[in-house]
């Protein structure tokens, strides 16, 4: 294994702001890791994700110090369109990423923009739809699907680009617990089958505790905790505005720390 993401002494503040949104971030992520990033609202999670695919500083302007390297490339120097074939990003609201008339067209959009031959585009579309279990939705309009189905389509559209990393910013924010768990299990399956590096921003720690290889807790723009779920979830996370999964919470109470 080697570092697919390497961040050194990263600081960032948005244009017009005196406050640093990210402060002194040092982070290495290995190829094939399933990493959960969590923390209270406004702690810098989304901003960190934007740094991974070049949206910062190439789209969101501001002052950036330090370095962000993904798959050996400096994201501040590589066009966002090229980075998109390496780092795929899925947002909270899947409908914001789906704008074609059919599921098939949405999934084909990325590979088409890579300039791939038609037969390769078709192969990738078929593969991505099959991997996500949504081949039966191929000719449906994305906007008549359920939230869970839409999120699967959004993930399939990213997967068709065959990225090395998929970054998901609270992808189940609008989904019920059952549908959320199905999405998380799907991500773990893709992580295992494809050795796909998964970076998941999430508050639903109860649902992802058993899936993550690693949990990163952010607070006030900094990484304050970084370790395995076993190491992180037995700590008192309430100081960071978080609740650990129920079993570690019970352990804390029995140990006199909760």
Go through each PLM region and give its residues.
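Conserved ABC ATPase signature
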Residues: 141-145, 149
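Conserved ABC transporter NBD signature motif
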Residues: 61-73
């Amino acid at each position: 294994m080697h570092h697919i993401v390497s961040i050194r002494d990263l600081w960032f503040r948005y244009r017009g702001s005196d406050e640093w949104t990210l402060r002194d971030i040092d982070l290495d992520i290995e190829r094939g890791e399933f990493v959960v990033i969590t923390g209270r609202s406004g702690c810098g999670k989304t901003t960190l994700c934007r740094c991974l695919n070049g949206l910062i500083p190439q789209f969101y302007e501001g002052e950036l110090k330090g370095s962000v390297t993904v798959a050996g490339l400096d994201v501040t120097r590589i066009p966002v369109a090229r980075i998109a074939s390496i780092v795929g990003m899925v947002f909270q609201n899947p409908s914001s990423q789906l704008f074609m008339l059919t599921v098939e067209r949405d999934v084909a959009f990325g590979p088409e923009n890579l300039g791939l031959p038609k037969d390769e585009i078709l192969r990738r579309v078929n593969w991505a739809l099959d991997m996500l279990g949504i081949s039966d939705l191929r000719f449906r309009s994305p906007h008549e699907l359920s939230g869970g189905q839409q999120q699967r389509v959004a993930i399939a559209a990213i997967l068709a680009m065959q990225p090395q990393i998929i970054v998901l910013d609270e992808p189940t924010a609008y989904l019920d617990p059952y549908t959320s768990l199905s999405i998380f299990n799907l991500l773990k399956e893709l992580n295992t089958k494809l050795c796909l590096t998964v970076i998941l921003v999430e508050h639903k720690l109860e649902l992802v505790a058993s899936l993550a290889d690693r949990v990163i807790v952010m607070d006030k723009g900094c990484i304050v905790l970084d370790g395995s779920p076993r190491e992180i979830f037995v700590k008192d996370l309430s100081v960071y505005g978080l609740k650990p999964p129920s079993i570690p919470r019970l352990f804390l109470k029995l140990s006199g720390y909760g």
